[in-house]
């Protein structure tokens, strides 16, 4: 069960959606949904900006994303890839405005509590950015700071409904 | 110099036309979103008044925060992809060096394009409106100061900066409590620490002058209290971490003690800020957590200080016989329970700070375009009147095909990521409207053949030349500092 950290009382609803998704769909690990993009003229390499390596047979690690529309996608990836790399390599809606250098919060993800404690603790600079993330939860992390490893094989992360960075002043 | 005509010859594909005014993060993220998400083919043009793109990313972000400028890579990929003739669906053009409202009227864009998005940011300064603010040497607004050290062609060689005697600047006052105020504090208090600045893209001209200043004391002066400071924890932490260079932060105990702030009443970010300040205010060896003991101060101790100063109203800027600032008169404020602020102007509450340089960092102000009143486009105080990005007329109706995104839509608040989200939301509305609207015409075009401007290719050359110059000077980039240099930069160095 996720506890929601309410920031100025405005974020709980959005966090709840992601928390709900993580809670209600534990058995859907293997289900993958495909979304179609409407691109009638040409496919564009611009949309495909990740550079993911293909894992060697037997060394695949699994990660499942719960997307904003509630659908799930599971990928087999290499050790060492960051969640931001993986999301971008598969054209998921995750921006990395600062290029994955822990200087913004556009790659905010909500980690399944079952996996959260297996992650190394966030550093100050990551926490400073999480302070500004929209829909912050107690298991929020930045996708650019989580590297795939055997410890978190099978990890499940939800994309928050919005990634807007807010601070208290936005509400005053 | 190249003068490329961008008359768009219609091909087999009937693209709807979109013009975006401004190429900073809001304009470029709006373009990016349209090109990424629109199901119908678009011809997107970004108009920029400078010959070069990226607005506040290039001229606002602090030089020692290169990672924040990484959004430019996304913009570049986007521009390259959609400028290429092989991309059959959408088309993208950048037009630099043209001011909408001057060389080309906003009316002309509105008449010619299926949608126009205003993303030109906040181009003015909020003022203190006190005696001495204008015309005193050594008094600058944060926008002027930041543009100057970032090499903006309007300010890089401005005599107000280059003729100022920096060698006399020891005490600095900064009015304001946002991240820009902290950026400026960092630049000034660490001005002589070459390892921070010499490899960045800071204007060399500015850095050489700044280095001359024997800055010892920087006061950040706020009208309200610690709770109301607007900066973010990352920027504040950077200031505390300068202690390894002998630079110490201070807050008077009457404005800050850990016990003043009940953690249950505040959010996570604020509670983290309280912990950060209370830990860093302790002597190095008395701190409880290792993350506040990363690098000790030098054995010689602290010799430079920055200070968060609260509950003051600036009253008057005082100058010497040569017209240069020498002090600032202020009074104490009382913060009432209903959050209202009361300046106390009796003699016991008035004081004078000796300062050699004063930067007013009160936020950037949105300014209406000259045609707004004629076209009846609404403007609310510091931003364009709009409903979810759709611009409103002065009588509150939706102005057809006209949108606003970024700071000029909402006022100058938020980091690049919040601007990005705003641009995406406005972009979605533009797409929504374009999908259902009839196209204006097949041959929408604005003839630029007789107007000097830059294209994306021109910017690529300028960029290459700036990077090349940078390499020679051991900097990430050496910007061209005047309009002439920028225009010539298209050709070579």
UniProtKB/Swiss-Prot annotation, chain A:
SUPFAM superfamilies: 2Fe-2S ferredoxin-like
First and last residues of the transit peptide: 1-16
Domain of life: Eukaryota
InterPro entries (alphabetical): 2Fe-2S_ferredoxin-like_sf, 2Fe-2S_ferredoxin-type, Adrenodoxin-like, Adrenodoxin_Fe-S_BS, Beta-grasp_dom_sf
One MF annotation (Gene Ontology) recorded for this entry: oxidoreductase activity, acting on NAD(P)H, heme protein as acceptor
Pfam families with a match to the protein in the record: Fer2
Assembly and oligomerization: Interacts in its reduced state with the apo form of ISU1.
Membership in a protein family: Belongs to the adrenodoxin/putidaredoxin family.
UniProt name for this protein: Adrenodoxin homolog, mitochondrial
Organism: Saccharomyces cerevisiae (strain ATCC 204508 / S288c)
